[in-house]
């Protein structure tokens, strides 16, 4: 008697394999696209954080190490925060140890934080982010304490072409810098 040697798969085996493939491929694509969106969000957050950290560190360092006086005008006629009762909010002009005047402002669209002097403009944030609202103010706790400068701003991701949620990020920055006597 001859044995029947069948090669191939039964219809049930084929249906099971096609079913498994049909279920697993959409799941794999879903996981893949979720990972891509998470990676895009991570990149945007890194960009926002890098720009915000850079801006706040430069402003803190310049104010702490270079500033001798704070004025409400670029001509340095009105000094602010010179007594305990005085307080002022932007724009604030800073006179440094070399006699130069500089200030911080937001300019252009997107709003970039810039450090400006009479002859130089240096952007502290790039065009991939927007720093808005930006607030700078000074006050004194008492007459014999040095002025304190409060800096407050939000750094947002900026893209004129997309409104996708994973490409939006926002970090709030605030600090107080005490001037040296």
Residue map of PLM features:
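Aliphatic-rich helix starts adjacent to a transmembrane/signal segment
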Residues: 2-64
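Generic detector of short, locally flexible boundary/turn motifs and exposed helical patches
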Residues: 11, 21-25, 44-45, 114-116, ...
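Secondary-structure transition/capping residues
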Residues: 39-43, 70, 162
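Short, well-structured beta-strand/strand-turn elements
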Residues: 64-74
